[in-house]
Amino acid sequence: MQAKTHILFSLICVLFYIDYYNVQNPIIFTILVLFTTLAVDIDESNSKLGKHFKPFSSIIQWILGHRGLLHSLLIPLLFYIILSFLNQQEIAIAIALGYISHIVMDILTPQGVYIFYPFKLKINGPIKVGSWLEKLLAILLLIAIAVKLLFVL
């Protein structure tokens, strides 16, 4: 998925989350979720964030490959456990939400994701990156965000 689609899906996830749970600082929570959803693609040197950290992202891509370890559920689980242990529950949830929302969207593509990496169980879907179907999904997510915001305000 493209960065904008990841951001839109993460944003709707944030809106639903803060609607049901008390978030101390919703602005920082949202920023952290959105940053994390883009940071997952640091293993792709041509991603939105990867371009800004080119030497680092190229090394990560060379070592781990794209949609390998960094696209598994192991990483958000580790972040969640460590941050929860450090009594940073809200940060842990924000990172997990951003990370998992990214993985969910990448599952919808034919390239799919090995969510239980290193086990080779790939889960994938029909939406090609940049296709009309992804554009339609982005429009639907934008509409969902607008509708959700109407009910919040």
Regions found by a protein language model. Give the residues of each.
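N-terminal membrane-targeting hydrophobic helices
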Residues: 1-153
